Amino acid sequence: MAARVLVIGNGGREHTLAWKLAQSTHVKQVLVTPGNAGTACSEKISNTDISISDHTALAQFCKDEKIEFVVVGPEAPLAAGIVGNLNSVGVRCFGPTAQAAQLESSKRFAKEFMDRHGISTARWRAFTKPKEACDFIMSADFPALVVKASGLAAGKGVIVAKSKEEACEAVREIMQGKAFGEAGETVVIEELLEGEEVSCLCFTDGRTVAPMPPAQDHKRLLEGDEGPNTGGMGAYCPAPQVSKDLLLKIKNNILQRTVDGMQEEGMPYTGVLYAGIMLTKNGPKVLEFNCRFGDPECQVILPLLKSDLYEVIQSILDGLLCTSLPVWLDNCAAVTVVMASKGYPGDYTKGVEITGFPEAQALGLEVFQAGTALKDGKVVTNGGRVLTVTAIRENLISALEEARKGLAAIKFEGAVYRKDIGFRAIAFLQQPRGLTYKESGVDIAAGNMLVQKIKPLAKATSRPGCDVDLGGFAGLFDLKAAGFTDPLLACGTDGVGTKLKIAQQCSKHDTIGQDLVAMCVNDILAQGAEPLFFLDYFSCGKLDLRTTEAVITGIAKACKKAGCALLGGETAEMPDMYPPGEYDLAGFAVGAMERDQKLPQLERITEGDAVIGIASSGLHSNGFSLVRKIVAKSSLEYSSPAPGGCGDQTLGDLLLTPTKIYSRSLLPVLRSGRVKAVAHITGGGLLENIPRVLPQKLGVNLDAQTWRVPRIFSWLQQEGHLSEEEMARTFNCGIGAALVVSEDLVKQTLQDIEQHQEEACVIGRVVACPKGSPRVKVEHLIETMQINGSVLENGTLRNHFSVQPKKARVAVLISGTGSNLQALIDSTREPSSLAHIVIVISNKAAVAGLDKAEKAGIPTRVINHKLYKNRAAFDTAIDEVLEEFSTDIVCLAGFMRILSGPFVRKWNGKMLNIHPSLLPSFKGSNAHEQVLDAGVTVTGCTVHFVAEDVDAGQIILQEAVPVKRGDTVETLSERVKLAEHKIFPSALQLVASGAVRLGENGRICWVTED
């Protein structure tokens, strides 16, 4: 027992954390700052007085006091970057970084994040102007009655209005009346969801998620959920409304998906993740995220933790949660009831004596103090929510009864509390439980009706070898009756991917079946196989007969086109697996070819063979995750007219153009023996599919100018700013299949293909491919798309399409106000900027520059140089943060430290500084004084690359500034700053774009376009 732990906060949550940590045999002492009367003087728990806003001083305190780790209770320090700042100087801190804590500190960020990662939440919009917010409230096609301040508002920034007018009034109070200060500069307007609200928390080390038992809070002040909103008047755990299956679903679809998404976006999330969830009739939906334990949820969850909390936190900090998953008490329930001061949540009195603690403890109850203080040796009230009484018993009803006894024992004048905590759970447990299979979500009668509807559709696909009759346990196929003598079988399975999402959003289900069949039969065609029969798998949460019939009708029609029988399938109705209106598809095709007709014939393929491209009908069924993201960022909806040149249809209809089925048209060509290989251009595009049918030492060179690239690809390239490689690796770019034939057989092969009404042309040649070289090279792809996407303007073609370069990731180092920081922030927010500020680092805490960055939503770190023994150690700490944020360019904006040689050499050509004179004149820290002393009439500023010698780096840009009669250092400095604000962003843009770089000879190199 040697460890000392620091808990930050002063509420009931922090008292509970300290109480649980003190139970560990590893812990010698738990310090709490600022703490309350409950944490002031027990055997292992005591308060300490150290500022939590001065992270530098706090870090030094932790080092001096040999603190093993810090546990942060409330949200504000997390949002202020306490975790990153302490970790950066070697003090372990439990909780998410400021960047990860945006899930709570910015509701707008959280909602956008959930949309990006497919996490179910209420429909919403964010606004910075009250009128626009109110217009949306009045016109939304859903009840837009939930108004949230986007920033932190101490748990009070959510207003649930009863009418549109009340919602608009809430907007005005928040945005114009500044009810929540800066937190309300942006408001989020949300759909009002119906259902029960539960709290689902988990521990996570950034990868593993360990759910806690679900809890339910009671926000309203009075019994029956009446009265004003509060921070919480009580809670119970576990919430029986959340079954084990539902909790697993919440873990997988919400908690794990959130943690994985933060990892993918470069913001690993560690600590406690709290999801406030509404249990709607359409499944669980996230109301909000918190980045710490809830209060009072903490007071009912941690008492049920069987594991050592100290060990759990250590495993999370070590990234080893998977090896030490927490264990919870079985067959127990916990209830906590809050006792509040008279007048809460409005004005309340302080200093009222509290009695009865020994009596409550004698009942076996835990009393966790919150708004309390010690005065003359007595415990007195010191806040709105004063304390919580927690009971742990074998069931919820018993726990509530015991908690009520504690409420009777503890007394203070004007105490307010609820006696009905857990009433929803009790009502739930008392409900009758007789259910039918249909009530559980599976309608057998509807399934049988569907089978009867699709039987004739399947029957119509019968062919030699197979007489389809649905309803048996399996289907049969007679190869001999189909005319085969020495056959090989080929099989393939596939799905449609997220093209389904567009079909479901557009309510267009009649063509998606052809996509499914085509993806499977085209795959086996690449083996030379004739498709014989097909089986489908259709799964949904709730069977909709009209939708399902439309999909399977499309499958049956596609099977007829392909010449294969729809031999059978499976329709699975699985409640809770899919949201209403959603379904998934999978297909399975079996085909055959005579043994001597198997493809590819690798031994026949030689250098110089021709590659014939078969036109696609459009996107086919690949790349739709990218397509959907591009459409979401564009100005178009799926219901919008298609882009110019793409036909008279909606964008949704265009994207849903079904995949071509090539089996009937290409089989005669393949059986001629002239074709050596066929590649189906599916997932992986041109670059990854053609090599699958080539010998290892061969590749192909393709020329995009030889085939017609449909306009939709040009539009996607423009809107997504996609590179040539991204296009060729994701999409078919107009080629649905590629055939390899000898050069002397090209003419006859093309004639045969065209006889079957397929568009075909020679698109390239087979070439030798040295080891390590790309197997597929596509020339002129972007140029062809640019011509497609050009418009005639003043008699010349104007190009609308360009590949958007990747934005450079920029770190800014400051020591104070960050004199040029705001100019850099403003410029990098312009759409044309090629730079993006990802981190602001200061060597001093609580400076104005950090406020500017945090207001702009930019992560910050404080790395105090005084805590390091030398410059090299300090620079190493900075470098670690730069690497953590994958920094490309470093800007020094009023950074008053001389950097070490190794650091400067590492960032040579990637680090910019600005000096307030026209270098090489007037170097050093007092440039303005030198200018005035010299009596010159012109000075200025210089942006330069940083070199080891101070102010000696290569010059990027300069701006002249006049020295006026009567100038002082102050007036001249202000004039020069205006020029700095102009040229520093310009120089950053030049370096980020690659127009300026530092050459290998150490000289400036300007890159010009011909």
UniProtKB/Swiss-Prot annotation:
Organism the protein comes from: Bos taurus
Note down the stretches annotated as region AIRS domain: 434-809
Question: Residues that bind (6R)-10-formyltetrahydrofolate, according to the entry?
Answer: R871, M896, R897, I898, L899, N913, A947, E948, D949, V950, D951
Q: Which cofactor does it need?
A: Mg(2+); Mn(2+)
Listed InterPro entries: ATP-grasp, ATP_grasp_subdomain_1, Formyl_transf_N, Formyl_transf_N_sf, GART, GART_AS, PreATP-grasp_dom_sf, PRibGlycinamid_synth_ATP-grasp
Q: What is the lineage of its organism?
A: Eukaryota, Metazoa, Chordata, Craniata, Vertebrata
Matching SMART domains, A to Z? Answer: GARS_A (SM01209), GARS_C (SM01210)
Record text on cofactor binding: Binds 1 magnesium or manganese ion per subunit.
Q: What is this protein called?
A: Trifunctional purine biosynthetic protein adenosine-3
The UniProt annotation places Mg(2+) binding at E288, N290
Q: Which reaction does it catalyse?
A: 5-phospho-beta-D-ribosylamine + glycine + ATP = N(1)-(5-phospho-beta-D-ribosyl)glycinamide + ADP + phosphate + H(+); 2-formamido-N(1)-(5-O-phospho-beta-D-ribosyl)acetamidine + ATP = 5-amino-1-(5-phospho-beta-D-ribosyl)imidazole + ADP + phosphate + H(+); N(1)-(5-phospho-beta-D-ribosyl)glycinamide + (6R)-10-formyltetrahydrofolate = N(2)-formyl-N(1)-(5-phospho-beta-D-ribosyl)glycinamide + (6S)-5,6,7,8-tetrahydrofolate + H(+)
Q: Could you say which residues bind ATP here? A: E190, E191, L192, L193, E197, R220, N229
A GO CC term?
cytosol
Arranged from A to Z, the UniProt key words for this protein are: Acetylation, ATP-binding, Ligase, Magnesium, Manganese, Metal-binding, Multifunctional enzyme, Nucleotide-binding, Phosphoprotein, Purine biosynthesis, Transferase
This protein's domain notes: The N-terminal ATP-grasp domain carries the phosphoribosylamine--glycine ligase activity.
Pathway given in the UniProt record? Purine metabolism; IMP biosynthesis via de novo pathway; 5-amino-1-(5-phospho-D-ribosyl)imidazole from N(2)-formyl-N(1)-(5-phospho-D-ribosyl)glycinamide: step 2/2; Purine metabolism; IMP biosynthesis via de novo pathway; N(1)-(5-phospho-D-ribosyl)glycinamide from 5-phospho-alpha-D-ribose 1-diphosphate: step 2/2; Purine metabolism; IMP biosynthesis via de novo pathway; N(2)-formyl-N(1)-(5-phospho-D-ribosyl)glycinamide from N(1)-(5-phospho-D-ribosyl)glycinamide (10-formyl THF route): step 1/1
Spans annotated as GART domain: 810-1010
Output the superkingdom of the source species. Answer: Eukaryota
